[in-house]
Amino acid sequence: MYQNLIYEVTAGVARITLNRPQVHNALSPALIREITEAVTAAAADASVRVLLLTGTGDKAFCSGADLKAGLGEATSMGDALRTRYNPMITALRTIPKPVVCRLNGLAAGAGCSLALACDVIIMAADAYLSLLFVGIGLMPDAGATFFLPRLVGSARAFELASTGRRVYGPEAAQIGLVQRVVATTELDAAVEDTLTYYRHAPTRAIGAMKQALNRSLYSDLETMLNQEADGQEALGETLDAGEGIMAFLQKRKPDYEGR
């Protein structure tokens, strides 16, 4: 079904592995389309509790747009963003399930944007992020201008975007670009720990949190108070909420089913 990525679902985890190692997992039009389709499939699959996004190999998560593959396209850059990149980023931000990025290597250009669109980024210490758009006379896209200032503030966002410099793991964690940085040898274990947590978490509650937090970025207090009330009312009717409350009263660990 997929030619440019590997999609697997096991034990509540949907794993998307970008699989174009010969070009450092660069984003061709076909790969972008497949990522969007895979995220949509994970959203529709009730057995999926958490989504993992990573790249094949140990050198690159994603090196950004495949410029050679795009040369044969008649589509303008703006149309390419509107019809391909933007739907991919929107799918990641709106799936009502947590998205974990295993940042195993370089994440450059739109590859950096792709990583920043995830809910949790676990990064190898020797990997790096770079918004290298400026190096070819372009501005950051694929959501980077939205995510970056909200993560690190406007002044630092401008510095990173206007220089395109590399931000390695330790600095990325220090300035808030990523949530966790570990040694390369510990990356898989750290990722699996995080996946284990989320696949046993109350999935619908996590999805409601994600939706509310997304909306809070461009909303006001009154709107968010109403959003919280509506969300809590719906969650109060779920099986997971019933299980969570009962487990609390019985002083035991809850057994969530994602329902």
Question: Which residues make up each language-model segment?
Answer:
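Terminal low-complexity tails and localization/encapsulation signals of metabolic enzymes
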Residues: 1-2, 246-259
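Short, charged, surface-exposed hinge/linker loops at domain edges
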Residues: 210-219
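Hydrophobic alpha-helical membrane-association signature
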Residues: 31-34, 84, 114, 187, ...
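Generic structural signal for alpha-helix termini and adjacent loop/cap motifs
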Residues: 21, 45, 73, 95, ...
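Crotonase-fold acyl-CoA enzyme core
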Residues: 90-206, 230, 234-238, 242-246, ...
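Conserved CoA-thioester-binding segment of acyl-CoA-metabolizing enzymes
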Residues: 1-54, 90, 188
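Glycine- (often His-adjacent) and acidic-residue-rich active-site loop
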Residues: 55-91, 107, 135-137, 220
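Terminal peptide-recognition signature
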Residues: 16, 20, 34-35, 53, ...
